Amino acid sequence: MRAIISLFLISAMVFSMIQAVPEEXGLQLSEDERGGCLPHNRFCNALSGPRCCSGLKCKELSIWDSTCLG
């Protein structure tokens, strides 16, 4: 009985370690995107505020319209 419980606990630990690896890679990706333009929609990350892309850099949006300030 102890062997079955031990095997179950070891399996659960291995499974949780395997599941944690892709999440860490996703967190690194979002940290890298935070300062630059997002490639799929040419806008800056939402965490950087109201900004838009100009080339590969994020710039502030004008308050009165939706154009980028230079």
Curated annotation (Swiss-Prot):
It is found in: Secreted. Keywords: Amidation, Disulfide bond, Knottin, Neurotoxin, Secreted, Signal, Toxin. The lineage of its organism: Eukaryota, Metazoa, Ecdysozoa, Arthropoda, Chelicerata. Pfam families: Toxin_7. GO terms for cellular component: extracellular region. Expressed by the venom gland. The presence of a 'disulfide through disulfide knot' structurally defines this protein as a knottin. Its main location: secreted. Residues 21-34 form a propeptide. The modification Leucine amide is found at L69. Belongs to the neurotoxin 01 (U2-agtx) family. Disulfide bonds join C37-C53, C44-C58, C52-C68. The keyword Signal applies. Insect active toxin causing rapid but reversible paralysis in crickets. No activity shown in mammals. Does not show effect on mammalian voltage-gated calcium channels. This is U2-agatoxin-Ao1m. Residues 1-20 form the signal peptide. It comes from Agelena orientalis. GO terms for molecular function: toxin activity.
